[in-house]
Amino acid sequence: MSREEAIASLKQMPENLRQQVAGLTDAQLHFQPEGGYFSVLENICHLRDIEIEGYGVRLHRVLAENHPALPDINGAQLARERHYSEQSLQPALDAFTRARHANLNILEGVTKTQLTWAAHLEGIGEITLGKLLELWAEHDRGHVQELEKLLAAVR
């Protein structure tokens, strides 16, 4: 995936999420599928926190530090600790959107040389900023697919 393709994909996510959750009832937002998967609301809260504390921090560190060690984030642990199921949708969605736009502003200024800058991502290993960008877009796609399955079950 090229830088341009990844950025285009990342740009679409806030609007994709807004469209996916538009008109959902409280029961639909909180529907908990079997297997320990996130509800729709928990997905949005997760995306918000990973955008801010995961990919946003990783982006800043790769650009500011020489070969940083980037920690993994335990999304399930965050969901429990932060009580995602008790949060409100709109503030979470708005915070995700603001963070995504801020990160995109930085990404759009990244040079080809900076895309080759390396880091060590816990659980993955050695990556470049370009690879991090791909992982970011893949993370979005995974949640879009998860939300599509959830929405099919609740509508």
Task: For the regions a language model picked out, list residue spans one by one.
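Alpha-helical bundle segments that constitute or directly flank the non-heme di-iron/ferroxidase center
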Residues: 1-28, 50-61, 135-138
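Small-residue-biased structural context
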Residues: 1-3, 7-10, 14, 82-89, ...
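Acidic/histidine-rich alpha-helical segments that form the ligand environment
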Residues: 9-14, 20, 77-116
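Amphipathic, soluble alpha-helical interaction motifs
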Residues: 16, 20-23, 27, 58, ...
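Short, contiguous alpha-helical
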Residues: 30-75, 104, 118-155
